[in-house]
Amino acid sequence: MKEFWQTCVSRLEQELPPQQISAWIRPLVPLAYDETQAVLRVAAPNRFKLDWVRKNFSHQIEALAAEWFQRPVQVAFELPAGGAGPRMPAVPRTPAGAPAPVSAGMAATPAGAPAQAPVAPAAVAAAVQADAAGVVYERSRLNTDLTFDNFVTGKANQLARAAALQVAENPGISYNPLFLYGGVGLGKTHLIHAIGNAMVAAGTGVRVRYVHADQYVSDVVKAYQRKAFDDFKRYYHSLDLLLIDDIQFFSGKSRTQEEFFYAFEAMVAQRKQIIITSDTYPKELAGIDSRLISRFDSGLTVAIEPPELEMRVAILLRKAESEGVPMPEEVAFFIAKHLRSNVRELEGALRKVLAYARFHGRDVLSVDVCKEALKDLLSVSNGQITVENIQKTVADFYKIKVADMYSKRRPANIALPRQVAMYLAKELTQKSLPEIGDLFGGRDHTTVLHAVRKISDARAKQAELNHTLHVLEQTLKG
């Protein structure tokens, strides 16, 4: 077993960067090989390493094990049971320039070979101790399932992905801060986790923290209650990468914004990377200090749009593949054509279809199965776009009352949404200008025409407004 594992690590050293070998492969410890089941048991020092190695390196290790044992082998990764630890120490580092162990076609150890003797407790402790990369994962709160490899790219998000890759490769230099904005379920959270995972996987021992804005607020409150602001500042200022999700939740929380401003200034001054997500463009954030908004604008701001048809199909096919379910393209196209708003909705629809198929014993996914499983969703998405639907959708988006669409009030926070709704009513329905005016509280057709022209002109000049209109159009089209 020892000879096999040394050879396995040596072969992997020829395929993987040194940082990945140090961070992920060397801490692994082979436990035993079950000849009856053809299962190789391998221990990882902690849950984070186990999940990462299983997802990223299991196929390579299984291929090398199959070559050595001359049969297909399944690798079972596990944690040391009961604290007893593995029975063999991790493979020591090969000295620079030392030749890799050579074997005749990776010939297997004879079945009757004596078992390895137990190692000293010190070796066991060393084998299970998490190295720097493992500690980073434990503290980072990163989701290891969200990587660049499984992020589906299309026109809607290709610029955001390119910027994210650049930041992952050159943190603190290229775009700092990186500000990603877009509607719910479009992949913002996936992308920032992918950046963090890529930096940790590089094995450089970076200090990373993913935190939702609500959790950051909670951290500030706890620091205030415990009179521990020095510790709070010391921790956040020491990070190499800070990922803040949904920063719009900082709205109205002045102490939180103040502490974040100090952390922002300290990190940027040291060329430490900050990445922020929001549901809206920085200048449209309500209740956020102007100092912070100016800092957000100082880096790169990128929008993530709702996915186009081809991208929605690709997302469905990728998700079905990850579930181990073959999906014909015609089925993916059927779902994608009827559900257009965001990735989360697509994945939810797919889960509903799969659950329906399993419950009813349908082995093959078909368009008919989708129609049956999604009939409630399809009845909504197939409905005609009406002025009433537009008014409700726009009111929900801008967080105003539908009644404000008909009222005579004209404050800016109501006038703009009302004009947007009039513009969309003209673009997306067959109603005439007088008919639209009647549905907006009996307004004259010239008022509607003025709103349509104003929004049309502004859309061509303002990227934020264009993005907002695109999101609303995609939502209304279903």
UniProtKB/Swiss-Prot annotation:
Region feature (Domain III, AAA+ region)? 141-357
Which organism's genome codes for this protein? Bordetella petrii (strain ATCC BAA-461 / DSM 12804 / CCUG 43448)
Q: Give the encoding gene's name.
A: dnaA
Q: Which UniProt keywords apply?
A: ATP-binding, Cytoplasm, DNA replication, DNA-binding, Lipid-binding, Nucleotide-binding
A GO biological process held by the record: regulation of DNA replication
InterPro entries with a match to the protein in the record: AAA+_ATPase, Chromosome_initiator_DnaA, Chromosome_initiator_DnaA-like, Chromosome_initiator_DnaA_CS, DnaA_C, DnaA_dom, DnaA_N_dom, DnaA_N_sf
Q: Return the protein name.
A: Chromosomal replication initiator protein DnaA
Q: Which residues bind ATP?
A: G185, G187, K188, T189
Q: Which PROSITE patterns does the UniProt entry name for this protein?
A: DNAA (PS01008)
Lineage of source species = Bacteria, Pseudomonadati, Pseudomonadota, Betaproteobacteria, Burkholderiales
Family of this protein: Belongs to the DnaA family.
